[in-house]
Curated annotation (Swiss-Prot):
UniProt KW Transferase keyword: no
Signal sequence annotation: none
Organism: Rickettsia canadensis (strain McKiel)
Gene: psd
Protein name (Swiss-Prot/TrEMBL): Phosphatidylserine decarboxylase proenzyme
PANTHER family registered for this protein in UniProt: ARCHAETIDYLSERINE DECARBOXYLASE PROENZYME-RELATED (PTHR35809:SF1)
GO cellular component, one term: plasma membrane
Co-factor remark: Binds 1 pyruvoyl group covalently per subunit.
Topology in membrane: Peripheral membrane protein
Amino acid sequence: MKHYNDLFKIIHREGYIFIASFALVSFLLASFNTKLGCIGFIATAWCIYFFRNPDRYVPINDDLVISPADGVIQEIKEALPPPELGLGDVAMIRVSIFLNIFNVHVNRIPANGKILALHYNPGKFFNASLDKASIYNERQSVLMETDQGQKIIFVQIAGLIARRIICDLEEGNEVKTGERYGIIRFGSRVDVYLPLKTALLVSKGQTTIGGETIIADFGRKKTAQFKFKRK
């Protein structure tokens, strides 16, 4: 039974209905036409691949902010936080991570701390790689306070293909770095907002691994010492 449980753990639950549907259609197609059946099974395999949910080795240190998503850093710029969070016109550093359809789409908590506020904002579905996606696209914004007292924001943004954002967090949740908290289906973007004086450890064009890549270090003046924990 443990092996079956392990199998389901490596696939995000949001994928179960898609995988089952693709598999059923594939069997039906195969009963009529072998080639169509093969195409269906290839699509099913891709669906399993898309919803994969691998463990990661998360760096454990209260000063660190880790990437909430797999992808490529599309942009790093000074920007105002999402207006729906009510933080006013205090500029922050925005690190934008673009996910293509081949990336792992499970999202992870970027730091230890407490969830202060969440806000879902319905919107449009522009290409997530465009700068205006941060403003106009459907998004789920999360404000948290880290254990070090720093306020940071992470935002799930739907893209041209992505049409569903899943966020399992609630206001008041105590969270740990690297914990899974949601998923965006089929191509998307995740923005991370940090205080202006934060020491960044990434650059534009860099590939990130959700739960592993260190984006920033609030204790950069100290000697960085941390361990890793599998999650």
